[in-house]
Amino acid sequence: MPGFIGREQHTVDDKGRLLIPARFRRKFLRQKDEESAEKAKRHEVLYVFKADDGSLELYEPAVWNEKEHQLLKLSDFNPEERLLTTMIYARLDQLELDRSGRIALSREMLDHAGIEREAVVIGANAKMIVWNPDRLTQLLADNAGSFSGLANRYVKGDGKSGVS
């Protein structure tokens, strides 16, 4: 199944609620005819991660569970691995979607992303990325000349990443 693709801007209400675009919700919300109630219930949450670039990354449970599986391999007895685990989980939250398809972002999450009234939600295949519209515009403008070089370096024509 194709991942999340597209970009939409939405208003964040006074309670910090952000509407997840309907086309993205359709990718992971319950499908009553195909899934059991228990399995569908697990799909009504999103994992929200505060990224280093000032955005918020949203993951559906199945995708986050894959990342979590990797984190479980880290040792609590290795200081660097323990630090990484702490840093990741200190930036992570699990949020339920309400009946209107919104998530309630905490003040901490909103402040991290610099979001006040408007937010841009970008579908980025396995995740969604939430940006302050002005920050996103500035990021894209500042890096406009980098696109071809980055694409050439990291995305090969054969579909394989150039990163080893």
UniProtKB/Swiss-Prot annotation:
One Pfam entry for this protein is MraZ
Matching entries from Gene3D superfamilies are given as:
Transcriptional regulator MraZ domain
Q: Which UniProt keywords apply?
A: Cytoplasm, DNA-binding, Repeat, Transcription, Transcription regulation
| A cellular-component GO term for this protein | nucleoid
Give the superkingdom in one word. Answer: Bacteria
Domain annotation SpoVT-AbrB: ranges: 7-63, 92-135
The entry's localization annotation reads:
Cytoplasm, Nucleoid
Say yes or no: keyword Metal-binding present: no
Q: Which GO terms describe its biological process?
A: negative regulation of DNA-templated transcription initiation
Q: A GO molecular function for this record?
A: DNA-binding transcription factor activity
Task: Return the HAMAP family for the record.
Answer: MraZ
Which PANTHER family does this entry report, sorted A to Z? TRANSCRIPTIONAL REGULATOR MRAZ (PTHR34701:SF1)
Q: How does it assemble?
A: Forms oligomers.
Report the family membership. Belongs to the MraZ family.
The protein depicted here goes by the name: Transcriptional regulator MraZ
- Organism field: Chlorobaculum parvum (strain DSM 263 / NCIMB 8327)
The taxonomic lineage of its organism, from the top, reads: Bacteria, Pseudomonadati, Chlorobiota, Chlorobiia, Chlorobiales
Give the gene that encodes this protein: mraZ
